[in-house]
Amino acid sequence: MRVILLGAPGAGKGTQAKFITEKFGIPQISTGDMLRAAVKAGTPLGLELKKVMDAGQLVSDELIISLVKERIAQPDCANGCLFDGFPRTIPQAEAMVAAGVDIDAVVEIAVDDEEIVGRMAGRRVHLASGRTYHIQYNPPKVEGKDDETGEDLIQRDDDKEETVRHRLSVYHSQTKPLVDFYQKLSAANGGKPKYSHIEGVGSVEAITAKVLAALS
């Protein structure tokens, strides 16, 4: 089973990806991991990628698709894989179709922007230990202080509201159109890939149950 998980940053894709990979015994594939592995392995494609990256250029969709095809041919992908953060754009999705990379299921985890802003902007971290809190869902005993050490908690730059809103706007302009793309592809191909829209609000268990039901 080859699965693409779609959803805005903060929608809970990482949590659900973990359940999917464990349930189906498939690896999670991210372009970042693939790029690093190919460069490290020194394959012909890896050397080509290294040249591009060393020059500070963006890796072309063609190279990324070649990388995907090389990766999914490996033994651990025999039963499928879960694509993490790929494809991000319509040209990448079209290139996958053109390259004959079949996808079995596309799952969209939909969460309202304001809910995501609340989730992410409320996070606080104790840097030394990595302990995380949330001002609304999991507040520290003393505001702004770590429960165990009493040291200050910080808000990571990634979690600041303006950063979250910027990432959401990039998602809506670049990646959200994939929802439409895969819905149309599914309709045109007699339901392949199977497309599922899941509301990502509620308990983790409830959302996981919906995701796994969509994939069964």
Curated annotation (Swiss-Prot):
Entry keywords, A to Z: ATP-binding, Cytoplasm, Kinase, Nucleotide biosynthesis, Nucleotide-binding, Transferase
Signal peptide extent: none
Coiled coil segments of this chain: none
CDD domains: ADK
Pathway(s) where this gene product acts: Purine metabolism; AMP biosynthesis via salvage pathway; AMP from ADP: step 1/1
Classification via InterPro entries: Adenyl_kin_sub, Adenylat/UMP-CMP_kin, Adenylat_kinase_CS, Adenylate_kinase_lid-dom, P-loop_NTPase
SUPFAM superfamilies referenced in this protein's UniProt entry, alphabetically: P-loop containing nucleoside triphosphate hydrolases
Residues reported to bind ATP: 10-15, 123, 132-133, 202
Annotated segments matching region NMP: 30-59
Binding site for AMP: 31, 36, 57-59, 85-88, 92, 156, 167
GO BP annotations listed: AMP salvage
GO MF annotation terms: adenylate kinase activity; ATP binding
UniProt-annotated location(s): Cytoplasm
GO terms for cellular component: cytoplasm
Highest rank taxon of the organism: Bacteria
Location of region: LID: 122-159
Catalysed reactions listed for this entry: AMP + ATP = 2 ADP
Pfam family, one: ADK
Primary subcellular site in the record, as a coarse category: cytoplasm
EC numbers for this chain: 2.7.4.3
Similarity comment: family membership: Belongs to the adenylate kinase family.
Reported function: Catalyzes the reversible transfer of the terminal phosphate group between ATP and AMP. Plays an important role in cellular energy homeostasis and in adenine nucleotide metabolism.
Oligomeric and partner information: Monomer.
UniProt remark on domains: Consists of three domains, a large central CORE domain and two small peripheral domains, NMPbind and LID, which undergo movements during catalysis. The LID domain closes over the site of phosphoryl transfer upon ATP binding. Assembling and dissambling the active center during each catalytic cycle provides an effective means to prevent ATP hydrolysis.
Annotated PANTHER family: NUCLEOTIDE KINASE
Protein's name in the database: Adenylate kinase
Organism whose genome encodes this protein: Pseudomonas putida (strain ATCC 47054 / DSM 6125 / CFBP 8728 / NCIMB 11950 / KT2440)
Name of the encoding gene: adk
